[in-house]
Every structure is written in structure tokens, then in C-alpha cells.
Amino acid sequence: MTAMTALETVRLLGADQQHILTRAQLIEHGVPSGTIAHRLRPGGPWQRVLPRVICLQSGRLSPHQRLRAALSYAAPKGERPRPGSVLLTGLAVLAEAGLPSAGHPSDVEVVDVLIPAGRRVASRDFVRVHRAPARSTGMPAGFERDDGLWSVGVARALADWAPFAAGSRQFRALCAEAVQGRHCERADLLARLLGGPVATAALPHVQHVADELTCGIYSVAEGEAREVLRRAGLPEPLWNPVLLLDGRFLAVPDAFWPQACVALEIDSRAWHLRPADYERTLTRGNRLQAARLPVVRATPHQLRSDAGPVVRELRTLLATGPHGPYHRITWTRARG
């Protein structure tokens, strides 16, 4: 095979891989080392992205190319990346999943990858390497995405990223968005956060999120409301319980005190992933009021800046309850 024929073959291969190839792939397809070096010269048509990883284009890499380059770099040296041998994890997975607090994929500065224990690959440039525990169940199976890249699930991505979370608020928001948006189940996320490395499970923001998830909190706004209620000395409510009226579904309020039959609804478009979610919140409050259950409404801003009136209203209702058809109301825990 001539160098030109090899280059044509490589171009076809590159088109299937977003123009990201390893040096081993180029050599395997007949591209001489001298040709590789020549095309990587300053001002040449190719660029070295990472050790052993080459982009068959010049210019800035797309978010997808960065992900593919990271997987290629972390693959066994001298081998083609094998499906599932290296997995994407961390913030890049969360951004690609569309979690609002993760930002746009193009804004992700560090690409996290997960490799089996015992592999000798160091973090480099924009790639941060995680190693699975050295046990038979350490390396998750992962899954192939629509774009052909292999990834862990959202729950595992959150657990791997937890030690590097810059702020507890963003981490709380991401975990809430993951559960609320049904990217993962609450029980799975809890298992990942608390069942991984001891150092990760002991982090204050991980403990905080685990506590909130355990009691059924699904948003930062609800978590902040809980803190306000605790500081005020109000009893702990149920969070996101499923209320039944005469055995039939009634509503899922943000917070509910079953002894007094009082509900708290936190009204804010900012904490709903879709406009329809906000409309459902309003409808939910109306259903509760139609059933003659008192509903206290508050916005996140109100709870942060002037929670006094909300606390006083709740305190009065809790002291004068139970209200409405309390003997006909039953409840179950929030979905897991």
C-alpha cells in the first residue's frame, strides 16, 4: 500500500471517528512514521492532541472530539480503543446528558475517564484518569452512546465527579436534576455516593446530598427550605410524599405535615426543568386547596431573604391542625 493510498484509507476511517485516531491506528493502516511526522509539523494539516492521539484536522477540537481523544489516550498503549475498555465519566457525562447545572458540553474543561485498576495511565492535559476499584465488580459495564462513545451512567458520573466539585451548591443541584429528570434512580445514586471510596462518602457535600436524597428532597430549593424550617424549630415534614384521598391519588406536595394536614409548595420556574413542570406545581396546589387542605406558598427568594411570614403562617397552621378531611388522607413515600 502506498502512502497516498494509506492516507485515503485513514481519511475514511477518520470520518467515522470524528478525525481522531491513535498513532497505532495510523501505523496499522500503512501510514509511514515519516508521513505522520511531516503532517504533524508546525502549520501542517494534522495536530497532536495528546500523547499517541492525533487529530486529522487543524484548529480547535469540538466537544465530541475532546471526548473521543480522551478515550483514545486512556486506551492500552499501542492498541486500538476497545469498546468498553475505557469509559467516560464525570462532568462531561452530566453535560452531555443535559443536566442544566453541568453547563454546555463545550464549557467542560476537564474530561474524566474511568479505566480498570492496575492500568498505568496518568492524567494529562485536559484528561483526568479515574481507576476502578481492584475487585471483580470494580469496572462497570458501561454503555455505548448514540455517538459510539462508551460511558458510565449518570449516577456513577456524579460519584466520580464528587471529589472535584468546586461548590456544594452545584453538586446538590446536579444530584437533584439527575433524580428529578429521571436520569437515574434515587436509590442507585445513593448507593454510588455512599458505596464508593470512603474518602468520597465522607465529603461534607456528599453527606449533605445523601441526607437530602434519603428524606426525599429533589431540588436545591427544597433543600434550602428544609434548612429554613430547621432553623425556625418547626417539625420535620415529609418531602415529596404521594398523598391519597380516600385511597385515590391527590397530589405530591413539596413538603407535608401529616399530623396537621398542612402542605408547603415552593413556587419557582428556576427549579423546574421544563415549563410543564412549573404548571404541574400550580395545578398540584390547586388540587390540595380544592380538597380543603391548607397550602402555604413560598418562593426560594422569599425563603432566603424574608422567611419570617412563611414560618409564622406554618407555625400557626401546625398549631391549629389537623385541617380539612385529615381522616381521609393517607400517604406513601416518594418514588425511589
Language model features by range: what are they?
Residues 1-202, 238, 319-336:
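Short gly/ser-rich loop at a beta-strand->alpha-helix junction or flexible surface loop bordering the NTP-binding
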Residues 2-4, 31-32, 179-336:
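Surface segments flanking catalytic/ligand-binding clefts of nucleic-acid enzymes
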